[in-house]
Amino acid sequence: MTREQFLESNISDVWAFVSSPHNLKKITPNEMNFIITSPNLAKNMYPGMIISYKVSPIFKIPMNWVTEITHMQKHKYFVDEQRLGPYSIWHHQHIFEIKENGVLMTDIISYKLPFGIIGKLFHKLFIKKKLEGIFNYRFNKMNKLFNQK
């Protein structure tokens, strides 16, 4: 899944927001009951940072999720990968390009569900739509934060 969004802001302000794991809750739908559980979490992300949280993505079933910031170049990109959670694979690239009058933010998400054919069926029936809804919510929140002056 790939998503692009133009933000009418400078790279410093966009980066300050997206590189703080404490802002994840602000761009996650309330019904997901997102709670960061990492003790003493740093203000800003860094390569090797582990972020643990509880989230209820489907049927209000709470689950633990742990991601690691595996790669990062300030004002350019960062990558988070699931270390524990509902996916067999979760690799999320966040790319930032300075453009005239703003920043183009691109999300590239590669993921795979466990359980073979059952996982594929579950994806078709529930997961794909849920992920699209989450990223639509994030798009709208980022739009309100950076594009409505």
PLM-predicted stretches and their roles:
Residues 1-2, 62-66, 89-92:
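Short, surface-exposed coil-to-beta transition loops
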Residues 1-46:
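Hydrophobic ligand-binding cavity/cleft-lining segments
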Residues 7-9, 55-59, 71, 86, ...:
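Beta-strand elements of well-folded, non-transmembrane domains
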Residues 36-84, 137-140, 144-148:
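Glycine-rich portal/gate segments that line the openings of hydrophobic small-molecule binding cavities
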